Amino acid sequence: MKTEKQLARAYGELAQRLTGKRFLTASGLTRKEAAALLNREVWLEKLGRVLPIRRRVLCADVLELCRPEMERLAGSEQPEKGWLVYIYGTTSRILYPDLGPRPEDGRCRAAALFYLEVLRLVLDYEREALPFDPAYDFAFLSQEEFSGCTQAEEYRRFLEDWREQHIYQLLRLGNEATPFSTLSHIAGVHYVAMAAARGLAAAGVPVDLALVSGAAAGHDLGKYGCKPGERVPYLHYFYTDQWFTHMGLPVISHIAANHSTGDLEPENLTVESLLLIYADFRSKQERGPDGREVTRIYGLDDSFQIILSKLDNVDAKKLRRYQFVYARLHDFEDYMRSLGVDVDLTGHPAPVKELPSVVLRSNRHSSGYLRLNSASLRFRSALKV
């Protein structure tokens, strides 16, 4: 009975979405055409193949659920490189229309938008059913949590844009339609940044959690705006800023688009900027045996070595710059540790370590105290704590 209720609820949500004004306007379908895709018995059976969810959903499996309706919509127009690649490109163009039209657009686009609505529904149920995974999931702030933040209104609109522009579906599609794993990197950055931000907030440091969350989740969206032949590592910052600015989110954009290690050089960075750069530094990607990207969250020391191993034409000047970045992030991490922030991601606040009485301190204790106190004073001054 519970499964039957879930299926009926899921079907009702899908029907409401596909006959709503937003979908009809985007797809160019009439309400009658959309309703013709929603045979109740057919879709209750289809949804019953995936609900209740017990494992990670594959975009390819959802495609098979939708294929008959999609092919009916597309008619003789079929994507040259297959549906998943086409839908991935369609979703990228929702964020970045300047990528331009493709020959298959038209009825194929309506089919892709239909698929995206079904995928969104299934992924919503996946999030409800499965344990949180920092490589896949985003623990966005609830309205109650962000209502007191300075950037509450921008964050509310960011969450709306994230959902309406199918950004999470785009990230999941990228896992299967490309050899890249942008999802796990972005999700990992968001996880690290928010764990640290919450710890700082609990310790009394003024930090805008909404600003950190929006910037961390959106910091690499510009990768989807890069055109063939463009150098993604250099230009994605520009396209990230372009998307946020176009959506009217300038404050989040300023943090999200300025997350390179070079942005650490100005002395007075906001705590939100430091958190994003720190989290991005720790979430690193490597190639697995099959050539696909694998993302892991490393400690600062390991991340620094990985970065050095990937640098081209490392001269003394470039090495000094990265050593400076590493040292500054290390000071920031030490400062967070001194406040009990869970930088090791154990899920529990770290105990604040107290030094022995002055008369009992060893030379090691004293030198460590001086270094930590110096970093603490510097960050407290910079962050106006």
Stretches with model-predicted labels:
Residues 2-154, 177-207, 218, 228, ...:
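Divalent metal-dependent phosphate-bond-processing catalytic cores, especially two-metal-ion Mg2+/Mn2+ enzymes
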Residues 169-175, 218-222:
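A short, surface-exposed helix-loop junction/capping segment
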Residues 189, 207-247, 253-263, 280:
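His-Asp-centered metal-binding catalytic motifs of divalent-metal-dependent phosphohydrolases/nucleases
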